[in-house]
Regions:
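Extracellular and organelle-lumenal recognition/adhesion modules and their flexible linkers in secreted
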Residues: 1-165, 181-185
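Structural recognition of the beta-strand scaffold that forms the well-ordered cores
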Residues: 166-171, 175-177
Length: 185
């Protein structure tokens, strides 16, 4: 939800422009409240409203939201969608054309991440033109794994000896080239 504002922007969200000519607005009404966020462009843009959220590593989440579009035309971009920034394949289906409020969702695994950037994306790896509204963005925890890290140390066990050739190799040569022969361990 985008109901709380700070300095005219939704609390915790910020506009990002990847390719110029995007107009960012907080618009009324929203799908379920007084406000939604809007991105528009007449000349084509690749932009987003973005927020950083904390997640549990190795957990499954559902990212969902509602999008409304008017005259979205692709100029190389996918359309209007939600995605997890810099996480390949973590994106919803893209909307183009004109659509009333449409629910979209993505189920994903957080991997080893403990924080992720959610984007309300206008464009998607290329430009689109038109208008898009986003509202009721939710991130729901579905399930997770209990991590039980463990290590076994065999202090009395002798392993292979360190080779006499481990030093004097490429990395030390590189050190002489870069650090003028100064080497620290």
């Amino acid at each position: 939800s985008f109901e709380e504002l700070k300095d005219g922007k939704p609390l915790g969200w910020r506009p990002r422009t990847y390719q110029p000519q995007a107009v960012f607005e907080v618009d009324s009404p929203g799908r379920s409240g007084e406000r939604s966020v809007k991105i528009s462009s007449t000349g084509g843009a690749d932009a987003s409203w973005s927020t950083i959220v904390k997640v549990k590593p190795y957990s499954r989440y559902r990212l969902s939201g509602w999008i409304k579009t008017r005259d979205i035309k692709s100029a190389g971009g996918k359309g209007v969608l939600l995605n997890i920034h810099q996480q390949p394949g973590m994106e919803t289906r893209a909307l183009t054309g004109t659509n009333d409020w449409t629910r979209i969702e993505l189920i994903f695994d957080s991997g080893l991440n403990d924080a992720l950037q959610i984007n309300c994306l206008f464009g998607g790896w290329g430009k689109v033109s038109g208008e898009a509204w986003f509202d009721d963005i939710q991130l729901e925890y579905i399930s997770g794994r209990a991590l039980k890290p463990q290590a076994t140390i065999y202090a009395n066990q002798n392993l292979a000896p360190v080779s006499k050739y481990i030093y004097g190799q490429f990395i030390e040569h590189l050190g002489r080239c870069i650090y003028q022969g100064l080497w620290a361990e």
